[in-house]
Amino acid sequence: MTAYKPYRHQLRRSLFASTIFPVFLVIIIGLVSFYAIYIWIEHRTIHQHVDESQSSLHHTEKQIQTFITQHNNSFQELDLTNHHDVTATKRELLKLIHQQPATLYYELSGPNQFITNNYEHLNTKNMYLFSTHQLKFKNSTYMLKIYMANTPRLSEIKKDNRQFALIVDQYDNILYANDDRFTIGEKYRPQQFGFMNESVKLNHADHRLIIYKDIHENIEDGITLLIVMAVVLVLLVIFGFISADNMAKRQTKDIETIIQKIYYAKNRHLGTYTPLKNNSELEEINNYIYDLFESNEQLIHSIEHTERRLRDIQLKEIERQFQPHFLFNTMQTIQYLITLSPKLAQTVVQQLSQMLRYSLRTNSHTVELNEELNYIEQYVAIQNIRFDDMIKLHIESSEEARHQTIGKMMLQPLIENAIKHGRDTESLDITIRLTLARQNLHVLVCDNGIGMSSSRLQYVRQSLNNDVFDTKHLGLNHLHNKAMIQYGSHARLHIFSKRNQGTLICYKIPLSRGNVDV
């Protein structure tokens, strides 16, 4: 007996599979989905902020360039050695700086002159060099450098979304940072874990704006939540195990009793009827087990008898398929032909090998009718070599009938019987007519042989129902028994014959069960 797990164990496992684990799985999926959506939203936000910041910086740069272009002629008329012209220059540059949406500082340097709005003396080395311009004045050419300390947009992003900004050059040197974790002038090394970032090119000098966010705190919160969920799951498993085991023991006591009775019934030791302790619908199963046990005992004896008969029929099938007399006669014919007609002998050997391959094929007990007819034609061809072409075979069949499936060797015994018992010294004509009607294949095998007398015909008809060991007419008897096993009582085999007028065999094969191997 196979060692199965008790039903209460399966019930307990089913409780986990159907309640606890799905709930936990939903929570896990929800948590993962939340984090996936969170990451997606953050990426979208960073992308949006990068675009907005890039647009803002480009706009500021464009305004500065436009201002410089428009006032270029005015600057050429000013002389920075003149106090009034210096004041005018400062006023114009401050006007430029104050119009921009950013905190900017300028430095105008030239021969013996330095002008700036960096009154607090901030270190411009920690600022981003926004742009550089050459301005021609009346007395000389000066260099204008504009530094960016911050922009309102980057400050808002840092304050509202905790997203920080960097500006790096083409060698990843940090030119600007609003995060204390980075120092201007150092190399920028992207963090491999816990950071989301996106960058965009700012100008032709390959300066890049990088906006990033630190999500370490979010990841740590997620890990903490997972630990809490794991602890809750362990508690649920322990509680569910104890509860399910107690409930399963109460609910499955009668089921275990029934399983024990099934085991006894399987080993044919059930004994007399005993009711279950609890009056429930399981009593119906208990009654059915005893009724089924009694029915099985009756069927077992019948099946054992049927199996013995099937084995006997299979043995006879093997004996008939090998056809020792036919093989012996054919081998003698081949021996005779080797000296007279080697080519014809080779043809006979090929036909015989094809017949043996067909009859000994064991992968399926069903074949197409067309294969069976080819086998019959080869069989008759070999017999004609022995009997000097005295056997004429005619097959009348539609193309549809030829593609129907029947049991293997279901027609050949009819032809074998016609040749063996119908032939005399004259030629023998055998006609096979195949028709389809109402899901049945009707086979008519007619010959013009010597036929049978009434008494002989009666004897042959009775032999069809005899045991395979109790008759010498193995071919028809075996065919009839095989058809009854494979097709049931729907198969019919009728024999009609008159002395010196030939024999007619009518054979009906149901097609609805023809595809089932036996």
Curated annotation (Swiss-Prot):
Post-translational events: Autophosphorylated.
Residues of the Histidine kinase domain: 297-513
Transmembrane domains' residue ranges: 20-40, 222-242
Cellular component aspect of the GO annotation: plasma membrane
Cysteines engaged in disulfide bonds, as pairs: none
Enzyme class: transferase
Membrane topology value: Multi-pass membrane protein
Any one GO biological process: signal transduction
Annotated coiled-coil segments of the chain: none
Pfam family, one: His_kinase
Principal location class: membrane
Keyword annotations from UniProtKB, A to Z: ATP-binding, Cell membrane, Kinase, Membrane, Nucleotide-binding, Phosphoprotein, Transferase, Transmembrane, Transmembrane helix, Two-component regulatory system
Residues with Phosphohistidine modification: 325
GO molecular function, one term: ATP binding
Cellular compartment(s): Cell membrane
EC number: 2.7.13.3
Disruption phenotype: Deletion leads to impaired growth when the available carbon source is limited to glucose-6-phosphate. Deletion also alters antibiotic susceptibility.
Keyword Cytoplasm assigned: no
Top-rank lineage group of the source organism: Bacteria
Catalytic reaction(s) noted: ATP + protein L-histidine = ADP + protein N-phospho-L-histidine
UniProt entry tagged with the keyword Phosphoprotein: yes
Function: Member of the two-component regulatory system HptS/HptR that regulates genes involved in hexose phosphate transport system in response to changes in extracellular phosphate sources. May act as a sensor protein kinase which is autophosphorylated at a histidine residue and transfers its phosphate group to the conserved aspartic acid residue in the regulatory domain of HptS. In turn, HptS antagonizes CcpA-dependent transcription of a subset of CcpA-regulated genes involved in antibiotic susceptibility.
The protein, known as: Sensor protein kinase HptS
Provenance organism: Staphylococcus aureus (strain NCTC 8325 / PS 47)
